[in-house]
């Protein structure tokens, strides 16, 4: 594949001679706007999702399972939709699904939640593929225009976005903590006011999304107005779905993509219900998830700053996985619910450690896909959401039927396999990069030596 020829190119700093610095756009403005827009939208959706399994019981659990099944299947066609619409238009359209889902929570029933969940699956697929495509594109343009190292810019841009995005858990759950009250016999009050506040926040985020600039050349990218082009695009859809899975690099990182979804679903479906709620109540879910979001944000920004290439990504991901494993082992072997200060502190400490792991995974996976799949960004991020949403859906559907201990064993096994697979992938790609760089060096050295000779081929023949 053509993309394989460049898999390690961003990981090697170019010399000053090879870079042409030209005056260009400053794309940091668009990163700020995109990040704030996602913060406003997801502080509402994230907090609502955290409450689904505790407030809406089985309806909430099944609705989230339906949502992520829809998300998984729609992600298979999301790259085509984003290419046809353009990443900015896809981002704007994607916000509508989140608005509708929160609105459905004003009157939660099977007739409101199931359709809203199905549509949100589609909307989520295009907004996340659009986000990954847009952020990667402007990072590359910014690096090219300002003569910066591409891998570092991708890391910084992803670090800022994911740090701001992680703050949605902090702010959204602080709002939940302030407005939601525990009632008698496990009931809660204040949910209607909470959802109205969330809808207002989402509306602001949607409006703000209109102010990001389109990617250069994107206007002519999708053949929306051409019936022939549209038919050709639809005909190529099976190839677009299958082709990424024929790339050995994608197959090698599938366990990492799936684990990132598993660990998120564990927090949303199991941790909030089985650990936080019994210890500090339904209203305490907001406080625990606020701590989770705060550490998630800090680690997203920090990890993004240290990202420079495949080796750094592997090292950072391993650190995040070790942090999360400590919580899984604690819950499996040593945790017992207690009263008093420790009974409140333990879930908060666990939430903080899980947030560290999530912040690391988010930034590093996005940077990894951007570095390895330069020629098919939409397809790469679509695969990310396919495997993430599939893993999340499995957890939500199994949650009512599987014990916490069994889930923890699954998480530990998957974590260990993911870490080993990530190290193997890094080693394989690094060796491949060394062999290619050695070949390039030998070729360049041969050319330079030959050019330094006093006579050329033509002159040597004419001389003799």
Curated annotation (Swiss-Prot):
Locations listed in the record: Membrane
Main location: membrane
Any one biological process term the GO annotation gives: potassium ion homeostasis
Record field: transmembrane: 31-51, 62-82, 84-104, 110-130, 160-180, 192-212, 251-271, 275-295, 313-333, 341-361, 392-412
Membrane topology: Multi-pass membrane protein
Record keywords, A-Z: Membrane, Transmembrane, Transmembrane helix
Entry's Gene Ontology cellular component terms: plasma membrane
InterPro entries: Ion_channel_UNC-93, MFS_trans_sf, UN933_plant, UNC-93_regulatory
Family: Belongs to the unc-93 family.
PANTHER family reported for this sequence: PROTEIN UNC-93 HOMOLOG A, UNC-93 RELATED
Protein name: UNC93-like protein 3
Species, as recorded: Arabidopsis thaliana (Mouse-ear cress)
Lineage summary: Eukaryota, Viridiplantae, Streptophyta, Embryophyta, Tracheophyta
């Amino acid at each position: 594949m053509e993309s394989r020829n460049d898999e390690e190119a961003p990981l090697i700093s170019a010399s000053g001679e090879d870079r042409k610095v030209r005056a260009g756009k400053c794309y940091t403005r668009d990163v700020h706007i995109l990040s704030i827009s996602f913060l406003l939208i997801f502080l509402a959706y994230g907090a609502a999702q955290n409450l689904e399994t505790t407030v809406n019981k089985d309806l909430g659990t099944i609705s989230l399972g339906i949502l992520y099944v829809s998300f998984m299947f729609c992600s298979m066609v999301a790259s085509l939709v984003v290419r046809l619409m353009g990443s900015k238009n896809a981002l704007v359209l994607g916000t509508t699904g989140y608005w509708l889902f929160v609105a459905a929570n004003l009157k939660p029933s099977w007739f409101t939640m199931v359709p809203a969940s199905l549509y949100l699956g589609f909307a989520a697929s295009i907004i996340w593929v659009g986000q990954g495509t847009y952020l990667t594109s402007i990072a590359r343009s910014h690096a090219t225009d300002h003569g910066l190292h591409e891998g570092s810019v991708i890391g910084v841009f992803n670090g800022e976005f994911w740090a701001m995005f992680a703050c949605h858990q902090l702010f959204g759950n602080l709002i939940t903590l302030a407005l939601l009250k525990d009632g008698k016999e496990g009931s809660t009050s204040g949910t209607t006011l909470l959802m109205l506040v969330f809808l207002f926040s989402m509306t602001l985020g949607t409006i703000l999304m209109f102010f990001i600039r389109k990617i250069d050349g994107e206007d002519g990218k999708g053949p929306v107005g051409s019936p022939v082009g549209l038919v050709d695009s639809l005909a190529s859809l099976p190839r677009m779905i299958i082709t990424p899975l024929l790339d050995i690099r994608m197959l090698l990182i599938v366990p990492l993509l799936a684990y990132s979804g598993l660990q998120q679903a564990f927090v949303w479906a199991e941790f909030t219900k089985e650990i936080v709620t019994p210890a500090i109540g339904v209203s305490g879910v907001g406080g625990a998830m606020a701590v989770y979001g705060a550490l998630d944000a800090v680690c997203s920004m920090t990890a993004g700053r240290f990202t420079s290439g495949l080796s750094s990504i592997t090292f950072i991901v391993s650190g995040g996985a070790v942090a999360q494993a400590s919580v899984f082992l604690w819950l499996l072997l040593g945790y017992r619910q207690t009263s008093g200060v420790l009974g409140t502190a333990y879930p908060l400490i666990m939430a903080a450690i899980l947030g560290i792991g999530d912040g690391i995974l988010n930034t590093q996976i996005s940077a990894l896909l951007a570095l390895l799949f330069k020629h098919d960004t939409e397809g790469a991020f679509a695969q990310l959401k396919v495997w993430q949403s599939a893993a999340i859906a499995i957890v939500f559907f199994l949650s009512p039927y599987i014990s916490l201990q069994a889930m923890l064993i699954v998480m530990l096994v998957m974590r260990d396999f993911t870490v080993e697979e990530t190290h193997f992938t890094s080693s394989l790609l690094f060796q491949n990069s060394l062999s290619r760089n050695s070949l390039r060096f030998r070729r360049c050295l041969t050319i330079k030596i030959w050019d330094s000779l006093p006579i050329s081929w033509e002159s040597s023949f004419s001389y003799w």
